[in-house]
Amino acid sequence: MLSLPSAWLAELNDQHALITDPDGRAGVLAELAISAHRRGDVDAGQLADMLEFAEAARLWALIEDVYAA
């Protein structure tokens, strides 16, 4: 089962922030993921998943913005 840091998941689930600044929020998510890996909180596989989720969230937010306009 995939277990990711709860603080990181909270950031990932902040839809308003993602839609407001997709690129910036994805960057923050990536930095938080890398920091968690450096601290040893997540392994390499979890880091890869977190980075993929950050990119998926960015793309989702961009699509949401297009459909909201």
Language-model features: locations:
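Acidic, Ser/Pro/Thr-rich low-complexity regulatory regions
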Residues: 1-69
